[in-house]
Amino acid sequence: MATDVAILEAALEQFSLVGIRRTSADDVARRAGVNRATLYRRFGGRERLLAAAYLHEAGRVLEELTRRVPDVPEGSDADFDPAENVVTMFTEAVGLMREHRLLQRMREVDGDLIAHGMTVGATDVLAFAADTLAHRVRELHRWRGTEPPADPMDLGHTVARLIHSLVLTPGGGPDLDSTRSARRYAATVVVPMVLGPSVVEEAAQQPSRNLRRPRS
């Protein structure tokens, strides 16, 4: 609902300006243009509001990610490369989170609370991301004509948690500081996870075309 969105966006903006600890229900209600009773009726206390705000922002990030990464074609497309699609999705996801202005600002103001909220309290956000990734896994295997993993959701959760960990705990390897290094890591580690270990051998055999649809 429009009121819920207004409240969540007001909360995120207020958190980024003064921090979570210093944000009151009145601050959020005033910024959203609603009364305090409406805010409590919709979201209850601060913990529920914070969790809902995280999930709302995760949805916006995932929407932006889907805009940046090409869809998997329904039919044959000689120019579509599943491995490149996975590399692009991973690299863009890492970049979006690392460059996220609101997240970085909130980490500066309330680093400990954000760390807790984005780890212990990130269950719903990770589940949301995992569902999106699992759908992409199914689509990629459909396009290639290969058997998907027994449980694409497990793989979706694994990749979501991998990206989440790499972004929230930078340093110490792997090196993802440049687009080139992030793409290299995605090609050698993430692509085999998503498409199967044989993709590395297939790509090596077809260096000029990368990984296309297997011929029938």
How should each PLM-predicted stretch be described?
Residues M1-A2, V72-G75, R144, G196-S216:
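N-terminal intrinsically disordered/low-complexity leader segments
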Residues M1-R31, E47-A51, H56, V72-F80, ...:
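Basic, helix-initiating cap at the start of DNA-binding domains
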Residues I7-F15, V61, L65, A93:
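Short hydrophobic clusters on alpha-helical segments that form packing/core surfaces
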Residues A32-F43:
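Short hydrophobic/aromatic patch on the recognition helix
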Residues A52, T66-H100, G156:
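Hydrophobic alpha-helical connector segments
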Residues L62, E84, R105, I114-G145, ...:
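Amphipathic alpha-helical packing segments from all-alpha helical-bundle domains
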Residues G95-E99, H135-E139, G156-D177, V189-V200:
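Amphipathic C-terminal alpha-helical segment
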Residues L103-E108, A115-H116, T146, D175-L176, ...:
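Short, hydrophobic secondary-structure boundary micro-motifs
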